[in-house]
Amino acid sequence: MAIMDFGGVKEEVVLRKEFPMSKARRVLKKETIAVIGYGVQGPGQSLNMKDNGFNVIVGQSKKYIKDWNRAKKDGWIPGKTLFDIEEACERATVIEMLVTDAAHQKIWPMIKKNLKPGDALFFSHGFSIVYKDQTKLIPPDDIDVIMVAPKGSGTSLRRNFLMGEGINSSFAVHQDATGRARERCIALGIAIGSGYLF
């Protein structure tokens, strides 16, 4: 892992060759990763993880039939790998919150009641956590809270993945309840198709 100086700001940069896919698979081998939301980031992240051999399921509200049908068209199978949001959360050890900020607030009570000690809550941006006094999204103390933020749309993430390339992503650990949050975070970053993480 390299430390790089960007205009006086030191950043740790993790390359795929330093944290290869085989290591990511070892770190996440016992995890069930639920991607919540099949809108902007959900398709790219979930399909990349699926293609990389991870145990991933999708949680999508049937009320948003366009997204539900898109998930089915992309090969997710209702009752097997495609569930309503609550059932996906019940089955998961890692919950990726890839819905909109407004939806974070709406579904948070359902997500929170399904979190188990040792689970990980994953975001692709930090608004809901940073402004928790406004969003009321306050995770329990016994879970990991992590972020991997691809520097591009879910479409770009998927396109680059299919071309054998990655997209740069930022990563952060907000809460480490298990002692494994950082390793899980980097592994998920590699799993979704990041070229390198910083």
Each language-model region and where it sits:
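Glycine/serine-rich phosphate-binding loop and adjoining beta1-alpha1 elements at the start
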Residues: 1-32, 173, 193-198
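Rossmann-fold dinucleotide-binding core
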Residues: 123-198
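Rossmann-like NAD(P)-binding element
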Residues: 63, 74-130, 138-153
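Glycine-rich adenosine-cofactor-binding loop
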Residues: 31-49
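Structural signal for hydrophobic packing residues in well-ordered secondary-structure cores
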Residues: 53, 103, 111, 115, ...
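NAD(P)-binding Rossmann-fold cofactor-contacting core
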Residues: 44, 50-76
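Hydrophobic beta-strand scaffold residues
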Residues: 56, 78-81, 196
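Residues at the starts of beta-strands that form the adenosine-phosphate
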Residues: 32, 54-57, 144
